[in-house]
Amino acid sequence: MTRGVQVGDKAPDFTLPSQSGEPVRLQDRLGERVVVLYFYPKDNTSGGTAEACAFRDSYESFTDAGAEVIGVSSDSADRHAGFASKHRLPFTLLADQGGRVRKAYGVPAALGFIPGRVTYVIDRTGTVRHIFNSMTNIDGHVGEALEVVRKLQTEQPALGFPVG
């Protein structure tokens, strides 16, 4: 068993299909923006919907702070498309149907079988700067991630973050 990704590690690169069916590679999203990568159990569940809508409601704050939000679950790209449309989600959802990326990050399963809910803040260089792991504290995922993104914005203005 792998130890999973830790703060300070390079984020494992991957390519997965988005809700539009287009392949998305993590490495291609880094460089200009911080990536907030959140893993959640499933679309259209109470927790999955609450978390996605919380990220949606704070989406402008994330983009203003120089971050891109990306959600990952085992749902298909088609299911993600319906979920994103239904809840007006402005960010990318990725289909990790085999759980390969979840395993690469070491996202734990709740109760041993429910896919976990973990958020990673990855800086422009691809380094994991923060991990928040909680199945029940949905607001914590959004609030902590935004706080870290804003801190990175002030710490790393030379990397192209807007300041002020």
What are these regions (language model features)?
Residues 1-164:
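Chalcogenol-based redox active-site neighborhoods
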